[in-house]
Amino acid sequence: KLVALIPNDQLRSILKAVVHKVAKTQFGCPAYEGYCNDHCNDIERKDGECHGFKCKCAKD
């Protein structure tokens, strides 16, 4: 594994956190107006808005 090649445990956990954060980012959110509304309507049938780099779907 690529992570096993990184010797320092602290550095390894920092890199894992960065990769995890990037993987969860929805890049369409700030780039396209209405992206989150479409995203939330597709998955939850709710309205949505962009919050940073992630979509927030309306709560009941």
Swiss-Prot record:
Zinc-finger as UniProt keyword: no
Domain of life assignment: Eukaryota
Residues annotated as domain BetaSPN-type CS-alpha/beta: 26-60
Coarse class of the protein's main subcellular location: secreted
Subcellular location field: Secreted
One term under GO cellular component: extracellular region
Tissue expression: Expressed by the venom gland.
Keywords in alphabetical order: Disulfide bond, Ion channel impairing toxin, Neurotoxin, Potassium channel impairing toxin, Secreted, Toxin, Voltage-gated potassium channel impairing toxin
Role summary: Inhibits voltage-gated potassium channels Kv1.1/KCNA1, Kv1.2/KCNA2, and Kv1.3/KCNA3.
UniProt family annotation: Belongs to the long chain scorpion toxin family. Class 1 subfamily.
Keyword Coiled coil applies: no
GO molecular function, one term: potassium channel regulator activity
InterPro entries the record matches: Long_scorpion_toxin_alpha/beta (IPR029237)
Pfam families, A to Z: Scorpion_toxin_alpha-beta
Disulphide bridges: 29-50, 36-55, 40-57
Miscellaneous section: The primary structure of this cryptide Pep-3 is identical to that of cryptide Pep-3 from other Tityus species (AC P0DRE8, AC P69940, AC Q5G8A6). Negative results: does not inhibit Kv1.4/KCNA4, Kv1.5/KCNA5, Kv1.6/KCNA6, Shaker IR and Kv11.1/KCNH2 potassium channels. Does not show cytolytic activity.
Protein name, UniProt field: Potassium channel toxin Tst-beta-KTx
